[in-house]
A protein has these predicted regions:
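HotDog/MaoC-like acyl-thioester-processing domains
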Residues: 1-22, 97-149
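Hot-dog-fold acyl-thioester-processing enzymes
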Residues: 2-86
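Residue-level signal for alpha-helical context at structural boundaries
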Residues: 52-56, 92, 144
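Mid-chain, well-packed structural core segment of small domains
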Residues: 80-102
């Protein structure tokens, strides 16, 4: 697992440029236990996420991870880099199923800088892929960052 957590106080609007990349976050392989725990935490006990026989029965080839878990991985990447209090908007599209043992890598790129109500805002694109490069999530985000002066 890569942990590129940066002190959020060190990420300033003035220092971020369009085209900059966010330090990637690589998660350990998704496990069955992790999905059962996530089901308990989220209240989503759909057997598609916890029962291998059910997944085979309905044709998904086994268990698939909760989409919101993978979205949470992307959110972790954003909060690790920018800090937990600056996120203003976060939208994703689910593009593919995540399976047991998939290694998810989250990446992001800055696409725009602008001001809203005297806040320096950064817009960017994010994605989550597995070890084969298959896209699981694409999305966008907006954060409000402090200025140096």
């Amino acid at each position: 697992m890569t942990n590129n957590t940066q002190d959020p106080a060190k990420v300033y609007y003035d220092d971020v440029q369009v085209g900059d990349t966010i330090p990637k976050l690589v998660k350990p392989p998704v496990s069955h236990l992790q999905l059962v725990r996530y089901a308990g935490a989220s209240g989503d006990f759909n057997p598609l996420h916890t029962d291998p026989k059910f997944g085979e029965l309905i044709g998904t080839g086994g268990i698939i991870a909760h989409g919101m878990l993978i979205m949470g991985f992307v959110g972790q990447m954003l909060s690790d880099y920018f800090g937990p209090t600056v996120l203003r908007k976060f939208d994703v599209r689910f593009k593919g199923m995540t399976r047991i043992d998939d290694v998810i890598t989250c990446t992001g790129t800055i696409t725009e800088k602008h001001e809203v109500d005297n806040e320096g805002r950064i817009t960017g694109k994010v994605r989550a892929t597995d070890q084969n490069g298959d896209v699981k999530i694409t999305g966008t985000f907006v954060v409000a960052l402090p200025r140096r002066s």
